[in-house]
Amino acid sequence: MTRRIDFTFSDLIAGYVTGFDQSRDSFSLVTSDGRDFDVRLSANVYAELVRNLGEPFHDATGQLRSLLVPGRFLYAYGVFYPDGKDGSYLFDAKHIVILGRSENEFAFERSDWWMRQIHELGDFFLKAEFPEGVYDYREYRTSLSDMGGKLGSARQEADTISRLVYGFASAFMLTGEDRFLEAADAGTKYLRDYFRVVDANQNVTYWYHAIDVVDAKTDQKIFASEFGDDYDAIPCYEQIYALAGPVQTYRITGDPAILADAEGTIRLFDTFFKDKSEQGGYFSHLDPVTFDPRSPSLGHNQARKNWNSVGDHAPAYLINLWLATGNNAYANFLEYTFDTIAERFPDYENSPFVQEKFFADWSKDQSWGWQQNRAVVGHNLKIAWNLTRMHNLKPKDGYESLARKIAALMPAAGSDGQRGGWYDVVERTLEPGQKHHRFAWHDRKAWWQQEQAILAYLILNGTFGDGVYLKYARESAAFYNAWFLDTSVGGVYFNVLANGHPYELGTERGKGSHSMSGYHSFELAYLGAVYTNLLVTRQPLNLWFKPKKGGFKDGILRVSPDILPPGSVRIEAVTIDGAPYADFDADGLFVRLPADHGDIKVHVQLVPTTIALTAEFGGIEDAMARIAVSGDLSPNTMRHLNDAIEAALSAGAAGIRFDLAGLTSMSSEAVRAILMLKQHRGPAFRLEFNGASPAIRAVLVSSDISDEALVG
């Protein structure tokens, strides 16, 4: 039996450059999980800078070797040859993807990256679903091809419409482009007119699974689900996601009809899905006739509870409903679901993954359908993400400890340490002798699971501050932006292979299906902008709203973009229809709308309450300007130092004396920028660095800037 792979194969390596050997035209790389590779640059290697949707190819081939500096994170795709010494492998790189123009820069941390991405996503789906520019949802189709074309079926599913409405509403919030809100409003009305049922007898609201459009005036209602896992039942998650788009739209408009629909659907959850016994939680399915979760007609869904029925309320609609209203009832609902998750889902004596499916008494259901005793990697990450959000609303040790535990376990259990990215469904436990959790079907990676990782580690870093969380957030965002964006056609790929190449076969080929609509990609872009700008790079964030007359209760527009760490964000400025407006509570994050206002457009600029770097020009003494620098000096914060330097030069400084007593870190890019300042100003221009910590002083000395400046 062959004991080693004795053939060539192509694959991807993700990692950090540790050195470049010019004589061998090769560089060394260390992966996220600490494994070393030697990478030879093949004769035809080409390199590119990661690009956003809507951007052209950014060729970096000519500068490639100068870019291979220690610390830079990149992707190398190439060929392994079993020709090395003692049977080792040699790796020839064919394609290099660079994540930023300098070694410590990540392009997706630019303040406008996610905003431009959501803009492109919005336009892609508008063109795909409404090519004539008229937002008539009778023309909407669930299934879209990889090119964005409508496929044959005239089936319209409530959840996929709602998810797309969520996307359009989020695109409006980040861009202020009215067409996105018009599409969201039209979709919300269509859902209400064609899918909503108000049961006056039982005082609840529920939503049809789908309709089949027969012609312009005729359709066939599909009440119970016809999706295989949920056939002839009313799944809780479908009722949950029917609210996703309308509630996100409600955050913008305050339309009372949306709030009434949400309240009616919540009564459905509390009346029929909720287990009112001492066991608690929410059942996953109802019988479509009796609304009984224990009905034998439900088969393998009889009296079951799962992650979706308990955990999906929060991200799909409930957090957004609380953000828009501030209603304590919704905060209590959130607390109930997260307390249930924290109590029932951990199973760490048996697996690094949570248990996701249960019987009514919370005993484990490990024989259900496709899931068996398997883990969905993204659900674990989703729990960590949303627990952290909830911790910011109602802090509990149990929320923080479980979120941190998941964050610590998942990289080894669910991520790809060599190539980057996150896997899909794996076996929860290892068999004797196994080191790797076995894949349920394949080692492909789904777009939505990357989203969960990015958002989880971003908010974990923004809330608790651990640098390792930012590392994983950046690596996850790098994989998504490098490999999931269809920069040729638009939209994002459903799945990529383990090596990042698109997988376009079967139901995973298209850009729209029962499983994919405008939700996760838009949610990632929206919250990616929120978390990155306000919590990581500490930059302003702009949001737009269009309140309806008589909409928001007491005329209060709540503008908090998410449940962020308390006191971390404030309102900097507000305009209404382009004119400055001062009636707002900066720290309370709400705007008091004008009494009896009509149709208005509100623009709000949010800023972090603490910034990552301060650089203050303190005047000139003996021709030397004084600039005090505090915080983290990185590519994302260099603009503050540049502003202070510009002020000093404008004041006629013949040199600059930098006070670095408050500086906690200094990137190589910052040192090089100061060297270029010295070069451009000439030999008579003096530089002094005072008060630097030993670590900062070591950075300065190692860069040889001490040859050009006085380092005190």
Which stretches of residues belong to each language-model region?
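Amphipathic alpha-helical interaction surfaces in cytosolic regulatory modules
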Residues: 630-709
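Conserved beta-strand core positions
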Residues: 27, 613, 625, 656, ...
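Glycan-recognition and catalytic cores of secretory/periplasmic carbohydrate-active enzymes
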Residues: 2-609
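A general structural motif
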Residues: 161, 380, 624, 653-655, ...
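Short secondary-structure boundary/capping segments
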Residues: 306, 616-619, 679
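Short beta-strand/loop segment at the start of cytosolic alpha/beta domains
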Residues: 609-628
